[in-house]
């Protein structure tokens, strides 16, 4: 494979990304040096605005996996990825209206604190361990992806770039904490959009204009977006993306520490919701850019596919190879694209490191040593950032054998994120579920999702369900083409063509629904949780979202929890809690016999702010 090298200006543009990102970390380390508390370091003092937080949310999950993987998916399988437009909308609506209010009003720092309040410590610790494993695995994939791009376009050592990425991320995350991560993410989000726009403009010019791109994509069957086939074995259809994609991304947004940590860092609940909706706009923009980049790439390579012709060795190298071709005479712009890919990775890795440090400190260190000084807590938090930076970087080695970056990353989120989504749904939506049901449901969901994912890895789905759309090599100058027919499958068990062959986007749904069903059944068998033992602000039955439901049905959904519409409004306006030193609002118990009024609810905005946390949490 021919390697195309960077020019001097490419290195200048690329290096600028690293210097500016590191500089932001240094800036916040100096600016916040007098506020040496773990609270300031981990949640930015809970005084962030929705703008930078919204950009940070988008950048954190629109990583190099999106920059490199999504255009490649569209190039090979068509523009059905646009259906994620609908899935993202459902995800943000459910996150902002169902999950966020519970987490924000609690004053917690780690999402998994909620599980101890609702169930008990074993459930909390089990979920925390699963989250740590999931995040390290996922981060390994997104570190490896841009390193692959850099290796493809410059010949720079693959593992050298992996370690360079990890070092820079760990550096500014350890120095500046959450504020540095959020503001660096905002900068990197801008770089991602600019990088995509340059590819769209130059690529469409090379292809003869945008109209020509659409015409050639239509002729190549790349614009067949809405496939309503209900077969769950099909890789991408309208239903696999809307249903499976919603479950997958809801696990990422609704109950993920990286997301919730940013939301609770906002100054009010209203700002937190605005951040999510602002982030939705960013998700749509990046999705459209990535999909049209894939269509432009198909238009460019329609007569000579570099993948099947052997010019490149993996589908994830398509995008960087395409960029080097269209910017061959424009020094600096290939560097901008690689900076675009690395921007996504730096933001994701830094967010993951910060979140891992937070849950480890809050769920393990603080539980064992509750009376640590602020200074020591901050140093421990920074040490944890350093430790997880090393672990995430090392995990990238394993990502090299995981196949396509998009499927690998979403499979990881599905295997772990689905059961976690089910666990939090049991706690928030089903008041009668007890801790035995929660723990049993979590183990069931994990078992089911790993069973199907590992089975799919050993026995890949039949080619008829996953084979790409036709690709041509008719006009390749150097044709060393190998036959690309469907692979010959060895002896397979019957389950391999059914259970193991479901779309990877359904892994999360399998884990989530398995967790919920098992949790409900176990709770009914072992004895339902008494409603009187549950604090109202710990749950949010779905009936709350439907104002047209009668009071009778709403009362039924609350399963005996001491609650009615009047009580709910009173709880919102009073933010009732009892004082117990440095415990959070929900940890304060909300017992009726010891209620005091805690500031933090603005009746005019109908939104919480962080005054409550200033008063009672620290």
Swiss-Prot record:
Q: Where does the UniProt entry place glycosylation sites?
A: 480
- Give the UniProt subcellular location, in the record's own words: Apical cell membrane
Q: Reaction catalysed by this chain?
A: (S)-lactate(out) + Na(+)(out) = (S)-lactate(in) + Na(+)(in); nicotinate(out) + Na(+)(out) = nicotinate(in) + Na(+)(in); pyruvate(out) + Na(+)(out) = pyruvate(in) + Na(+)(in); propanoate(out) + Na(+)(out) = propanoate(in) + Na(+)(in)
According to the UniProt topology, which residue ranges lie Extracellular?
1-9, 69-82, 150-157, 202-235, 297-321, 407-411, 459-504
Principal place of residence: membrane
Membrane topology recorded in Swiss-Prot or TrEMBL: Multi-pass membrane protein
Q: Name one Pfam family in it.
A: SSF
Hey, which stretches end up on the Cytoplasmic side? 31-47, 104-128, 179-180, 257-275, 343-385, 433-437, 526-618
- Write down any Gene Ontology CC term: plasma membrane
Output the superkingdom of the source species: Eukaryota
What regulates the activity here? Cotransport of monocarboxylates and nicotinate strongly inhibited by ibuprofen, fenoprofen and ketoprofen.
Q: Which residues cross the membrane?
A: 10-30, 48-68, 83-103, 129-149, 158-178, 181-201, 236-256, 276-296, 322-342, 386-406, 412-432, 438-458, 505-525
Keywords tagged on the record: Cell membrane, Glycoprotein, Ion transport, Membrane, Sodium, Sodium transport, Symport, Transmembrane, Transmembrane helix, Transport
| Molecular functions (GO terms) | lactate transmembrane transporter activity; monocarboxylate:sodium symporter activity; organic acid:sodium symporter activity; symporter activity
UniProt keyword Hydrolase present: no
Give the GO biological process terms.
monoatomic ion transport; monocarboxylic acid transport; sodium ion transport
- What is the annotated role of this protein in its UniProt record? Acts as an electroneutral and low-affinity sodium (Na(+))-dependent sodium-coupled solute transporter. Catalyzes the transport across the plasma membrane of many monocarboxylates such as lactate, pyruvate, nicotinate, propionate, butyrate and beta-D-hydroxybutyrate. May be responsible for the first step of reabsorption of monocarboxylates from the lumen of the proximal tubule of the kidney and the small intestine. May play also a role in monocarboxylates transport in the retina.
Of which family is this protein a member? Belongs to the sodium:solute symporter (SSF) (TC 2.A.21) family.
The molecule here is called Sodium-coupled monocarboxylate transporter 2
Q: State the species of origin.
A: Homo sapiens
